[in-house]
């Protein structure tokens, strides 16, 4: 799974560290991601999504569906997952 926010689409970016003597070295900046359970009142169920802490602030302000639409995302993030709640061991046995 890529390190990408499911609400805003933000991911890892790369650039340079620049020292005092202007020597440039490559580095990456990773998104501060968390897993968050959100209750969908109109569907009466919980959804677990992976989002950045910045997106979490937006969710508290606007609500989940408005935040996804404003960022050009798909509401498919909220769709029930095919194997939600099933462990890897149970999938191997099946």
Swiss-Prot record:
Coiled coil: none annotated. GO terms for biological process: translation. The keyword Acetylation does not apply. It comes from the Bacteria. GO terms for molecular function: structural constituent of ribosome. Transmembrane segments: none annotated. The keyword Ribonucleoprotein applies. Residues 11-20 have a biased composition (Polar residues). Keywords: Ribonucleoprotein, Ribosomal protein. Residues 1-21 are annotated as: Disordered. It holds the Pfam family Ribosomal_L28. One of its GO terms (cellular component) is ribosome. Belongs to the bacterial ribosomal protein bL28 family. This is Large ribosomal subunit protein bL28. It comes from Leptospira borgpetersenii serovar Hardjo-bovis (strain JB197).
């Amino acid at each position: 799974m890529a390190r990408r926010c499911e609400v805003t689409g933000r991911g890892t970016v790369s650039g340079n560290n620049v020292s005092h003597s202007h020597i440039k070295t490559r580095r990456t900046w990773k998104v501060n991601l968390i897993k968050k359970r959100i209750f969908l009142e109109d569907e009466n169920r919980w959804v677990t999504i992976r989002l950045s802490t910045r997106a979490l602030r937006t969710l508290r302000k606007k609500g989940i569906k408005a935040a996804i639409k404003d960022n050009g995302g798909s509401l498919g993030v909220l769709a029930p997952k095919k194997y939600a709640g099933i462990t890897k061991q149970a999938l191997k046995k099946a």
